[in-house]
Amino acid sequence: MEFENKEVVNRPLVSVIIPIYNVGTTIYRMIECLEQQTFQMFELILVNDGSTDESEEICKTIIRNHQNYYLYSKENQGAFSARNLGIEKANGAYLTFLDADDKIDSNYLEILFHNCMGTDIAVCDVAVYKEDTEISRFTGGNQKITQTQALNKLLVRKEINSGPCGKMFSQKIIEEVRFPFLRVYEDILFVLECFCKVREITVTDKTTYYYMQEDTGTMGRMAKSPSVDIIAATEKIMDFIADRRDLSEECTYITISHLYQYALPVAIQNNYRGCEFILKTQILYRKYMEQILKCKAMPWKEKVIFYLYAHGYVYTNKFIKKIQR
């Protein structure tokens, strides 16, 4: 179902895409950020992904007051599906993605737009906040970097965050790229594919995207209901790294370590009994064991931990636990 407040007469320079799912308490904050932008030649595409709260009604109210705001509603499938619909509906020469519960600087669109014009992709600082405190920041200064440099920074989770937010893409780059059908980890695969379509990327610290971290821990939620989508995504990333001889070995180390950060809590939550997530993770570690053992960036202690896990044992608190079938 579509709710539009006017026909598109003139093509906007930028399309801003926001997936909407039960964000009735935070959406106005992001709308206020957009209203305060120094750059106003944009359209806003809100995609309601089957919200069960008042989000859709709030969005209908919002678009009535803005001629360049549009709302599309669909059944719940996940952020990947909502963003893909947003891409299909976008009319801008450039696209950027926001999340409804985050914040941006008032010069966010202006800075990214001007930096994106020369290289087709622009990346800005991303500050991670918990409540009112900044707990980390991705920052790469002001520079143009090569595709290889950008991929390395993305995959080692340094300077460039893994998600689509904090970035702007030209429409010609994103035209044939879509978010994969995964509930989690779909964002880094999307960004990875976009980065592979350009020779250079512009990085700027002149504006900031503020990621507002939830109070509830992602790892805790993941341990209770693990998603095998993480395993599928990790496999794609590992294959990508193996095919690219120009990438740092740290990319392998970080990718494998990041998966283990999910696998260990799942094993503990299940009292060291095997479940689908654990068994499939073990298969992945065995599949890439040669890459793991040859990785010069990975400490030997962690290689041993991953080897043990691949063969049914978990190392935790100086004890080795056998995973029960």
Residues covered by each model-derived region:
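Short aromatic/hydrophobic "clamp" motif used to bind/position activated sugar donors
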Residues: 95
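Membrane-interface aromatic/basic loop that binds lipid-linked glycans or pyrophosphate carriers
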Residues: 2, 271-325
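A conserved acidic beta->alpha catalytic loop
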Residues: 33, 48-58
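Donor-binding/catalytic cores of nucleotide-activated saccharide
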Residues: 79-80, 100-202, 211-226, 299
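Catalytic core of nucleotide-sugar-dependent glycosyltransferases
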Residues: 208-214, 220-247, 261-289
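Short beta-strand/loop segment that forms part of the nucleotide-sugar
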Residues: 42-50, 70-75, 100
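Glycine-rich, basic loop-to-helix element that forms the pyrophosphate-binding segment
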Residues: 74-90
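Short, well-formed alpha-helical segments that are part of the catalytic scaffolds
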Residues: 22-36
